[in-house]
């Protein structure tokens, strides 16, 4: 890691065998080291993380550390033995899903297991309804990951995720307040581009570049959001 960058450690968490778990400043990592850093990571997925360390992003809501640690133990062990990331994450996801089910998360959005998962059950609060009819919701990210998509991170919208109702954008409540505006910009820009016929890969890359620029030039965020209909 370049010397000009600060270390993102916030708090030493638990130790699991040879592994040290750290709570880290994910917003700083995404803004200065790796814009694609998600909720957690380990060395073989993100080489800038020292070996035998697990990094978990500081969460604004809903403690998911136990799920992430169980995932990382499997993922790191398999990749250390030569498994590909694709194979390792498949097995790690299975372990994580089992833990989430054991803690009763899925029952909370399926009316105690009697119905299919209800998207409205993950709504925390309506952030804003835009003039074009799109509703932006802050959602319970833990329940989204438990019931709909274990890889859901930061935000999403109806043009990418089939479980997001039509005309909705979701912002993960695990993202801290001071970072939500950048995630919101990414999701609105990406959705607008896809609604205009641009394929996901291109729309996502454009949105990532725009988000990254505004993270480094936060004075531009207000105007960038306005251009996407956030007025």
PLM segments and residue spans:
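Metalloprotease/metallohydrolase-associated module, dominated by Zn2+-dependent proteases
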Residues: 1-66, 80-181, 195-231
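Active-site recognition of the HExxH zinc-binding catalytic motif
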Residues: 67-79, 182-191
């Amino acid at each position: 890691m370049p010397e000009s960058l600060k270390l993102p450690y916030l708090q030493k968490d638990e130790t699991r065998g040879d592994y040290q778990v750290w709570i880290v400043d994910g917003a700083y990592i995404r803004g200065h080291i790796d814009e694609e850093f998600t909720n957690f990571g380990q060395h073989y997925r993100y080489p800038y993380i020292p070996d035998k360390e697990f990094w978990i992003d500081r969460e604004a809501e809903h403690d998911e550390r136990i799920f992430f640690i169980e995932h990382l133990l499997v993922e790191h062990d398999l990749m250390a033995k030569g498994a590909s990331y694709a194979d390792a994450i498949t097995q790690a996801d299975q372990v994580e899903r089992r833990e989430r089910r054991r803690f009763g998360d899925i029952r909370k959005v399926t009316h105690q297991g009697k119905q299919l998962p209800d998207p409205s059950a993950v709504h925390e609060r309506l952030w804003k309804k835009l003039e074009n009819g799109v509703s932006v919701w802050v959602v319970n990210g833990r329940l989204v990951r438990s019931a709909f998509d274990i890889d859901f991170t930061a935000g999403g919208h109806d043009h990418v995720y089939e479980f997001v109702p039509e005309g909705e954008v979701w912002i993960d409540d695990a993202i801290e307040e001071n970072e939500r505006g950048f995630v919101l910009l990414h999701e609105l820009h990406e959705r607008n581009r896809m609604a205009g016929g641009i394929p996901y890969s291109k729309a996502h890359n454009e949105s990532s570049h725009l988000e990254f620029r505004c993270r480094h030039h936060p004075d531009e965020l207000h105007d960038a959001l306005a251009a996407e209909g956030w007025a």
